[in-house]
Amino acid sequence: MAVDKEYVEKQLAKLNAKKRLGVGKELKHLHEVINKGENILGHTRGFYNGNTWLMCITDRRIVFLDKGMIYGMKQAEIPLKNVSSVNYETGILGGNLTITAGGSDKKIGKMRKQDVKDICNLISEAAEKAS
């Protein structure tokens, strides 16, 4: 069951979350996919499947959102209990994250270099608590 925008905005404010360039549309629709009682732990943006996606980590799952330019929205998710490993690498300008869940890898590229290590650690800790 989706929550109202205020619920999500309050959680993002507690995290001192900044609006991320390139995922403003997705942030506006995040309340449509967050469930009542689900807590947002962090978020960032990354490049996946040819597009820039919002990646939101909650206490239950990792949610990926890609809002189309004019219409449509794509959503993917990984339940934290299914995450078996998460790895990152950084380069000069950015970083990449690889999440292994259910025997398959999801690779997220072009992440902010400042975010990639923190997001990797956040997912690892949340997955450990969820299993």
Predicted feature descriptions by range:
Residues 2-35, 45-51, 68-131:
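Acidic, Ser/Thr- and proline-rich intrinsically disordered linker/docking segments
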Residues 50-63:
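Polybasic phosphoinositide-binding surfaces of eukaryotic membrane-targeting domains
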